[in-house]
Amino acid sequence: MANAPVGNIYTAALMQHNSHPDYKYEMEGCTCSHEGVNPSCGDELTLQLRIEDGVIEEASFVGSGCAVSQASADMMADLITGETVEEAKRLVGLFLGMIKGKALSEEDKEDLDEAAELESISRMPARVKCAELAWRTLEKLLADK
């Protein structure tokens, strides 16, 4: 995916996660939540987590925004569910580095799973904040965990 053309950000995975998100719902019994807003385009979301014994047992989000922000949030929630807080922080760092143009190893891309498909967005500055929204919200939410 590293050589994807700039115009090809709407991958099958992105469209699937946007059209049929598995993690877009209001969670009952969340242990923490945080709101994120992208003021430049109006994307907004509330990320909700249920953390037990240092493990993210459940992740969900609610909100509205463009296909990129919504798909990125769904991919992220899928990726971090079942992971430790520390691993989720590591994954956030990988994703935010990638979306800012940092080259990742194949192993790091595998760790990001479908979220690695958003790499081509790094070459579209106007869309970077859309892709980052959920991840930056997670970063802030986990900062004191």
Task: Give the role of each language-model region.
Residues M1-K145:
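Domain-level signature for proteins that mediate thiol-based redox and metal-cofactor handling
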